[in-house]
């Protein structure tokens, strides 16, 4: 299944907002069994969330965001994961 990185602008995101967004995301995922949220990273300094998802298509990622009421700035499909251990 393709893997995607999603960039979201969320300036001024409070802990309560983050909790609500996470709950909406999980609820949307419950209706979309082919979409899987892997993890997210938050940059308070930039007002961004960077999310990692597995999904059958870019359209499925957009549909999840729509159902969850989440912004999407950019979606990038990634196809190779590397780590420092690979080069030792």
Describe the predicted segments one by one.
Residues 49-52, 73, 84-88:
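Short amphipathic alpha-helical patches
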Residues 55-81:
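An amphipathic, aromatic/His-enriched active-site/gating alpha helix that lines ligand/cofactor pockets
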Residues 1-31, 43, 80-88:
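Short S/T/G/P-rich N-terminal loop/turn motif that feeds into the first structured element of a domain
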Residues 4-8, 38-64:
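Short, well-ordered beta-strand segments in beta-rich or mixed alpha/beta enzyme
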Residues 34-40, 74:
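A short linear hydrophobic-aromatic micro-motif
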């Amino acid at each position: 299944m393709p893997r995607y990185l999603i960039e979201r602008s969320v300036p001024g995101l409070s802990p309560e907002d983050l909790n609500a967004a996470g709950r909406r995301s999980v609820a949307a995922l419950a209706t979309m069994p082919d979409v899987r949220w892997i993890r997210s990273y938050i940059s308070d300094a930039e007002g961004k969330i960077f999310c990692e998802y597995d999904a059958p298509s870019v359209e499925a990622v957009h549909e999840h965001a729509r159902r969850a009421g989440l912004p999407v700035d950019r979606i990038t499909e990634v196809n190779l994961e590397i780590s420092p251990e690979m080069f030792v």
